[in-house]
From Swiss-Prot:
Belongs to the triosephosphate isomerase family. Pathway: Carbohydrate biosynthesis; gluconeogenesis; Carbohydrate degradation; glycolysis; D-glyceraldehyde 3-phosphate from glycerone phosphate: step 1/1. It catalyses: D-glyceraldehyde 3-phosphate = dihydroxyacetone phosphate. The active site is at residues 101, 171. One of its GO terms (biological process) is glyceraldehyde-3-phosphate biosynthetic process. It is found in: Cytoplasm. This is Triosephosphate isomerase. GO terms for cellular component: cytosol.
């Protein structure tokens, strides 16, 4: 991406998903130490399992490394067994939270309306939501990818985010763990469509909202992807589990 005086710093977000026991904290410490030695051009965040969030936040406190939750509930409290509220994420030391990740939408049937509720709750708790959108292979092959994703953006972002910090992550489901790769042209086309919708919804603020790419970003492809127009960072999955790989992506900027 090309930075200007009004463009926020890029964001490289490492989503550990359902991976990581206590020993994984050593990987986070290694990332933090490397970023202290050489401050990054981007903001960097790790999203560990909820069981590690508090300990990881303490382990990297004061470093150039943010932490966040992989999900939050739309309610602040109540009879929601197994769920975590946005306030709990913040209380554990997180400053960001992922809302509507493709695996949450697929595995748990989360709708865009529910995602919007999560994003609203996150912002109200002082967290920065990363709202995820993306299409399946079937939708893309039907020629409906752009219209589908734009609709997701529209329905997943509550108007209450106006004036609040948030970002959008584009996850092409067909390029995650399938062996398929989204071309830079695919990425640029979709990010441009998302940008247009953001400007339509949020006016000038929509011009500076970061749009992250989240389709199997790895050290080998990070530089090309991060240099593409309208790509404001990356939502990284498996490659964020090892400090060496994650740092290579961070340093690609």
């Amino acid at each position: 991406m090309t930075l200007s005086s009004t463009t926020p710093r890029p964001l490289i977000a490492g989503n550990w998903k359902m991976n990581g026991l206590s020993v994984a904290l050593d990987e986070a410490r290694a990332v933090a130490a490397a970023l202290e030695a050489k401050p990054p051009a981007a903001r960097v965040a790790i999203f560990p399992p909820a069981t590690l969030l508090h300990r990881l936040s303490q382990a990297v406190e004061g470093a150039h490394l943010l932490t966040g939750g992989q999900d939050c509930h739309g309610k602040s409290s109540g009879a929601h067994t197994g769920d975590v509220s946005a306030e709990m994420v913040a209380d554990a030391g997180g400053s960001l939270v992922i809302c509507g990740h493709s695996e949450r939408r697929t595995d748990h049937g989360e709708t865009s309306a529910q995602v919007a509720g999560k994003a609203e709750a996150a912002a109200a708790a002082g967290l920065e939501p990363i709202v995820c959108v993306g299409e399946t292979l079937e939708t893309r092959e039907a020629g409906q990818a752009v219209s589908f994703v734009v609709s997701q953006v529209r329905d997943s972002l509550p108007t209450s985010l106006a004036g609040k910090a948030f970002s959008v992550a584009y996850e092409p489901l067909w390029a995650i763990g399938t062996g398929r790769t989204a071309s830079v042209d695919n990425i640029v086309e979709m990010h441009a469509a998302i940008r247009a919708e953001l400007v339509s919804r949020f006016c000038e603020q929509g011009r500076t909202v970061l749009i992250l790419y989240g389709g199997s970003v790895k050290p080998e492809n990070a530089r090309e992807i991060l240099a593409a127009p309208e790509v404001g960072g990356a939502l990284v999955g498996g490659a964020s589990l090892k400090a060496k790989d994650f740092l290579a992506i961070i340093q690609a900027l």
